[in-house]
Amino acid sequence: MTDQPIPETEVLPATHPKRSWVARFFRFSRNLLLLFILLSIIWVVSDRFLPVFVTPLMVIRSVESISHGEFPKNSKKWVSIDEISPNMVQAVVASEDNLFLHHHGFSFNDMSKAFEHNLQGKRIRGGSTISQQTAKNVFLFPDRSYLRKGLEAYFTVLIELIWSKQRIMEVYLNVIETGDGIYGVEAAAEEHFGITASQLSRSQAALIAACLPNPRRFDAGHPSGYIQRRKNSIVSLMGKVEQVNFNKIIPPATRKHKHRHRTS
């Protein structure tokens, strides 16, 4: 008998379970991030054309009412920007974001002032632009975490790239909380003054704007002395800030399609 050669066995490379697990985790995280980016872009693009009827804040307020044994009040009515008085647009620009037409979503000057103000131990003040507030109201739950602020910045960039300034203002004025269970300036005008948003005077628009920092505490229909003083200040500012005219905005290259709404 002759000895048969022993076949060589293939030596497989040693596997490292820990490295394999880490690689799978990073692949999963990458795919999850890409999915989030894709879905968020689709969401923002769809909201560029469709009315926004429900926001996370509306859901939270409804759940709070139900938990207290109350029937949730949800007064809102979507209207286009040309059905809203220019006085209302001017009032929120004067009171909330006087550089709205010129910035690209962020006002670093206002953010710096708010930071210095808060460091002095005074009443906490935000430095959010109308674009940031719109991103927060439409896409996010109210929260003060760094994650939420990061997502707010992300969605702010998206709407500034995909929406026009006119659309940002239109959505903002339709979804902001303007009272207890009241959302948007059309519902606020009807609730507080018995008129439509297109009929708002400078004084009425300024009253609504004056209550925006805390609309569940203050009532534009029955203003306190503080709200009256704040209203007078806003009316004065309305005459000083640049007149809002969306037709005069030169859109960036990414904004190729302009909304065809009246602004007068």
Predicted regions located by residue number:
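Juxtamembrane regions of bacterial inner-membrane/periplasmic proteins
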Residues: 2-264
